[in-house]
């Protein structure tokens, strides 16, 4: 077992966040720590999207949604701000093609997190939140495994 898990800008790319968090929890020592960094939508290309609800995250978990899930592709295409994409600028057509090939490139943000969703999800997974920081581009959470 590990003392800590660090995840920076990963969980939003996972189709089933609760399943991932519970797996990460399994590799943590009892009372091990996790540093979780998620994108803050106001500072990136997700700013036009609605925040994901805990009910949606729970539904993905209960339905055992896997990484081939394309449920969010239309929203990711329709509300993606091409001007805020970091790195090389791309056309809408390129964005659509990248999104369709998500299983290979893992570009899609399946979910848009906010403080409420983070707290609900981590509480469900039995993590104790020790600190939370909101920056323009990042939501930073430091928590502890409650096992």
Where are these regions (language model features)?
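Short conserved loop adjoining the S-adenosyl-L-methionine
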Residues: 1
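Hydrophobic beta-strand segment of the Class I
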Residues: 5-6
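A short His-aromatic
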Residues: 9-13
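S-adenosyl-L-methionine-dependent methyltransferase catalytic module, highlighting the catalytic core
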Residues: 18-19, 23-26, 33-146
